[in-house]
Regions:
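Active-site microenvironment for binding and transforming phosphate-containing groups
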Residues: 2-321
Length: 321
C-alpha cells in the first residue's frame, strides 16, 4: 500500500519522489504487540535522508491510527483536549514501531517538547530528560527518538552524516523570525563539531504560500530580520471568488467583475526556512522540502488553519540507530 509525495530539491528545481509507506518494515513487531494492529498508517520520508543507513526518520500523516475525535481512525500524536491520552499513546507507539525506533523489542525513548513558538533549543544528553519547554532539540545519543509536533507550522529535521548527530525543530512564523533553524545549525556546530556541509535537512509538511495569508505585523517582523524579506511575501488577488461560488448572496449588489479586487498578503514560510539553512552555510543540494500543503489537504494532514484550531497533530521524528 503506497502512494507518492513530492519532495523538492531547490537546486535546479528538481522534484524527487518520496514513498508513502505503510508500516511494513516492522509489521512483525506490530503483530506481536496485543494492543497494536497495523492500521494502514502512512509515513513520509525524505529520499535524501533515507540514504543514511543509521538514521531513523519520518513525517506522520493523518490516516491510520487509533484516535477518533478528528475523524475515524486518525493518527493524532498530540495530547489535545479531545482525544483520549491512551489512544494518542497507542498512536505514538505505532509510529515508533513503524519507523524502526525499537531495539531488541524495546521501544526507544521519545523526547518531545512543550512548544511555545520560541527559538529555545535543548541539547539532550540523557535518555530521560526533564520536561522540556522550547521548539528545538538536538542529540548525538543513539536509540533515542526526537519528536516535533505540528499542524501547519513546518517541522525541520537536521542530520549530520559525519558526526552522527540529529536535530528536530518547530518552525512557525514566530520561530522563523527568531531564526530557529539557523540557530539549530549553530548549536550543532558548537555541541558536536558539525560542519554545515555535512548537515542534511528535510523540511516536512506545512502551510504553503498558497494558503498562508498574513497581516502587516508579520511582514514587518520579517523585514526587521531579513534583507531578502521582500522575496518571501506575495500579493494574491482574490477577486469575486465568493460571488462565483454563491451568486444568490449578491442578487442586489454589483455584477461580478466590477468590484475592487481583494489583495491578500501571503508568506512563503517554507522558503524562509530554506533561506536560513543556506545562510547557515548548508549546501543547497543538502536541503529537501515537502511540497504538499497541510491546509489544502485536510484529509491527509491535520491543519490548525483549515479546521479552525480543532485538530490533531503530526509528528516529525528522527533518531540514530
Amino acid at each position: 500500500m503506497s502512494g507518492s509525495a513530492l519532495f523538492i530539491c531547490p537546486q535546479g528545481n528538481n522534484v524527487l519522489s518520496a514513498d508513502l509507506e505503510w508500516c511494513v518494515p516492522t509489521l512483525a513487531n506490530a503483530r506481536r504487540a496485543k494492543s497494536l494492529k497495523p492500521t494502514g498508517l502512512k509515513l513520509l520520508r525524505s529520499p535524501d535522508l533515507t540514504r543514511i543507513p543509521w538514521l531513523v526518520h519520518a513525517f506522520t500523516t493523518r490516516p491510520g491510527g487509533f484516535t477518533t475525535s478528528y475523524g475515524r481512525r486518525t493518527l493524532n500524536v498530540g495530547f489535545t483536549k479531545d482525544d483520549l491520552r491512551a489512544s494518542v499513546e497507542r498512536n505514538r507507539k505505532q509510529v515508533l514501531l513503524a519507523t524502526g525506533a525499537v531495539t531488541r523489542g524495546t521501544q526507544w525513548p521519545l523526547v518531545t517538547l512543550r512548544q511555545v513558538h520560541s527559538d529555545i533549543i535543548h541539547v539532550v544528553r540523557s535518555r530521560k530528560p526533564d520536561k522540556l519547554v522550547g521548539d528545538g532539540v538536538v542529540t548525538d545519543l543513539p536509540r533515542l527518538a526526537l519528536g516535533i509536533l505540528t499542524a501547519d507550522c513546518f517541522p525541520v529535521l537536521l542530520v549530520d552524516t559525519k558526526k552522527k548527530a540529529v536535530g528536530a525543530f518547530h518552525a512557525g512564523w514566530r520561530g522563523t523570525v527568531k531564526r530557529i533553524v539557523e540557530k539549530g545549525v549553530g548549536i550543532m556546530r558548537l555541541e558536536f563539531g558539525s560542519r554545515p556541509e555535512d548537515i542534511h535537512a528535510a523540511i516536512g509538511p506545512g502551510i504553503q504560500k498558497c494558503s498562508f495569508e498574513v497581516g502587516e505585523e508579520v511582514e514587518d517582523a520579517f523585514h526587521t530580520q531579513f534583507d531578502y524579506a521582500d522575496e518571501l511575501f506575495h500579493n494574491v488577488q482574490e477577486s469575486d471568488a465568493v460571488r462565483e461560488r454563491y451568486p444568490m448572496l449578491f442578487m442586489n449588489q454589483r455584477a461580478p467583475g466590477h468590484g475592487d479586487p481583494c489583495i491578500k498578503l501571503h508568506l512563503d514560510l517554507r522558503e524562509a526556512n530554506r533561506r536560513q539553512l543556506l545562510a547557515a552555510g548548508m549546501p543547497e543540494a543538502n536541503i529537501t522540502a515537502l511540497a504538499d500543503c497541510t491546509v489544502c489537504q485536510p484529509r491527509r494532514f491535520f491543519s490548525h488553519r483549515a479546521e479552525r484550531g480543532k485538530t490533531g497533530r503530526q509528528m516529525a521524528l528522527v533518531g540514530i540507530q
